């Protein structure tokens, strides 16, 4: 829970522990007084897809997308690859209409909404965000676009950088 005090500082209360922490340094910009900040992970469930493993042949072959298919606000679907997925993996690794897909690596944060009338599987370098409640997913696409543009999101790590599930969960929106 994020709240302000009388001095307009922002604080977050962790419900599990009751701890209160000042988060002024994390607030990217001011918002209207009737709005509230929260963590992305509180309104979206999120997970990544399946890692490519050439020796794993369990399940059935399905087409899937990688970061090379995901662009800002669109998908390039002319050359899809196939990989084996088990029934259990399908539940975690399948995007459905309305899901916001976000690149973990490469152009970190690059996003698009899956608006097709059929499901698609995702590789492990793509985060799938599915809202817990009905909301305007396009708004959150624009938030990701803005945050990428102003440098609020970026990669972490030495070598190949990425946007971890934990970092994505903790993005303030």
Ranges and model annotations:
Residues 39-47, 55-58, 71-78, 97, ...:
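Basic, amphipathic alpha-helical recognition segments used for DNA target recognition
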Residues 102-103:
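A generic structural signal for residues embedded in beta-strands
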Residues 65, 81-90:
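Short alpha-helix capping/helix-loop boundary micro-motifs
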Residues 1-19:
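Extended, domain-scale alpha-helical bundle/helix-rich regions
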Residues 20-50:
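Non-catalytic DNA-recognition/assembly elements of restriction-modification systems
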């Amino acid at each position: 829970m994020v709240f302000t005090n009388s001095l307009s500082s922002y604080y977050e209360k962790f419900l599990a522990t009751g701890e209160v922490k000042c988060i002024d340094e994390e607030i990217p910009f001011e918002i209207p007084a009737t709005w509230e900040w929260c963590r992305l992970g509180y309104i979206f469930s999120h997970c990544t897809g399946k890692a490519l493993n050439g020796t794993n042949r369990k399940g059935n072959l399905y087409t899937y997308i990688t970061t090379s298919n995901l662009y800002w606000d669109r998908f390039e679907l002319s050359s899809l690859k196939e990989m084996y997925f088990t029934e259990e993996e399908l539940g975690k690794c399948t995007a459905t209409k309305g899901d916001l897909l976000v690149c973990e690596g490469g152009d970190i944060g690059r996003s698009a909404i899956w608006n097709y009338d059929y499901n698609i599987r995702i590789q492990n370098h793509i985060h799938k965000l599915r809202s817990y409640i009905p909301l305007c997913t396009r708004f959150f696409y624009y938030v990701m676009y803005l945050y990428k543009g102003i440098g609020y999101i970026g990669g972490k790590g030495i070598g190949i950088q990425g946007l971890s599930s934990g970092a994505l969960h903790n993005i303030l929106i």
